Amino acid sequence: MQKRHTFNTAQVMRRAEELIEASSNRYRITVQVANRAKKRRRLDNDDLEEGGMKAVMQAIVEMSDELAQPEIIGD
């Protein structure tokens, strides 16, 4: 039986594009997303199936929600 995901991949892609467009440095924002995903994966090691969303996608959603806070995008 196939699992149904509760997120829309098109929406995650749109949010990722918003993050990249809001950032002055594409490489830096990519590294920030990767670091946040790595941290989340370490912290949530016990709970592997949180909504069916992978750590990278969760990091993108979280960071795009925080776009109003420039310190997240800056350094």
From Swiss-Prot:
Catalytic reaction(s) noted? RNA(n) + a ribonucleoside 5'-triphosphate = RNA(n+1) + diphosphate
EC number(s): the record gives 2.7.7.6
Molecular functions per Gene Ontology: DNA binding; DNA-directed RNA polymerase activity
Q: Which Pfam families match?
A: RNA_pol_Rpb6
Q: Name one GO cellular component term.
A: DNA-directed RNA polymerase complex
Which SUPFAM superfamilies does this UniProt record tie to the protein? Answer: RPB6/omega subunit-like (SSF63562)
| Keywords (A to Z) from UniProt | DNA-directed RNA polymerase, Nucleotidyltransferase, Transcription, Transferase
Tell me the GO BP annotations in alphabetical order: DNA-templated transcription
Tell me the disulfide pairings in this chain.
none
* UniProt subunit comment: In cyanobacteria the RNAP catalytic core is composed of 2 alpha, 1 beta, 1 beta', 1 gamma and 1 omega subunit. When a sigma factor is associated with the core the holoenzyme is formed, which can initiate transcription.
Q: Briefly state the protein's biological role.
A: Promotes RNA polymerase assembly. Latches the N- and C-terminal regions of the beta' subunit thereby facilitating its interaction with the beta and alpha subunits.
Q: Which family does it belong to?
A: Belongs to the RNA polymerase subunit omega family.
Q: Could you tell me what this protein is called?
A: DNA-directed RNA polymerase subunit omega
In its UniProt entry, the species of origin is given as Cyanothece sp. (strain PCC 7425 / ATCC 29141)
Q: What is the lineage of its organism?
A: Bacteria, Bacillati, Cyanobacteriota, Cyanophyceae, Gomontiellales
